[in-house]
Amino acid sequence: MVASTVPGHAERTASPQLVNALRAAAEPLPAPENTAEFGACFDRFGDATVVMLGEATHGTSEFYRARAAITRHLIEHHGFNVIAVEADWPDAARIDNYVRHQAARPRRGDVFARFPTWMWRNVEVLEFADWLRDYNAPLIERRQVSFHGLDVYSLSESIHAVLAYLDGIDPDGAKRARHRYGCLTPWQDEPAQYGRAVLYDERAVCEDGVVAQLRDMLEHRLDYLRHDGDDWFDALQNARIVRAAERYYRIMYRGSTDSWNLRDRHMFDTLQALMGYRGAGTKAVVWAHNSHIGNAAATAMGWHGEFNIGELVRIAYGSEAALIGFGTDTGTVAAASDWGADMQIKTVQPARSDSYEHAFRRTGHARSLTDWRNGRNRELADLLRAPLLERAIGVVYRPETERSS
């Protein structure tokens, strides 16, 4: 659980006052399978510029269905036109081509092939993509809804994307890029090994080449834009990913805080680039884990020097940002026992008595929405300041040691 490092935290149970306040404020929700009815419960967030939808795990069907239902409603009734998810940019670009440009539906194994495959290669995401393709079909291009990845992990795929783009419009530029990216070639399939190599030999650093390549693409943007703006933007983002990924893997062995902050800063910068590229009036929905879309400054993460995309969005957009977390008590989850291991369906341990999830369970609501923004429920907001644990299940889940792992 992400808050297990709360300074001085001793096991405690949520106060009766907090449980009563939650029970009074909570609005019962229908099942997310009732898409229209469920989505309509989130009308209040339609005026936001950025709506961030979280999840307490990376493998719960209900979270994906709930986000899809909310997003559909925000698209249909409030003009949201960018979907940005905690996924690799090149894979999400394949989905974007499918939903906007009538490309063939990606085959199983063509996209989201990197561990953890189940995080985005699942029925719920496919059903949403099919719906989005149908929604976009009658619209002119500038009014269509786009689908993008925010993450930093696609070093190899992004290098190939930049080279493929330059091969088509600037062969000389492609030669320069191959030379600059050549330093990273030995590490493309196992980029974490690049960080280990740099740790022991600073001469292995590839920073100068990737920075020079990004600068080169920016300097030639007017020439490249004459061919196709969307293709140029895609290539530019891939060059930015190569730059960020090189640094991410280079510093990952120096400490988790620096690498975490770099990753979430890149996610925020990517979101900002998307907002700028789509132009005035752009409204975005972000799908990511609670640990990314929550306000890190209000949690143990912030106390240890970490920030996240949610905190950065809150700073940038203020009241025009809505951060919506998702919690769970019991059930099952798709997860692995170790990084790179096979997916398993695991039983989720009941929420600890000293957790927010346990407090919500005690309200008696199976599903509910609780909104305490803008001082509308000051008593509840004050009660929620009491330090409790918050569940955060990632792609690796070991139920027997959930808090410590």
Q: Where on the chain are the PLM-derived regions?
A:
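Structured catalytic-domain cores with a bias toward divalent-metal coordination
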Residues: V2-S405
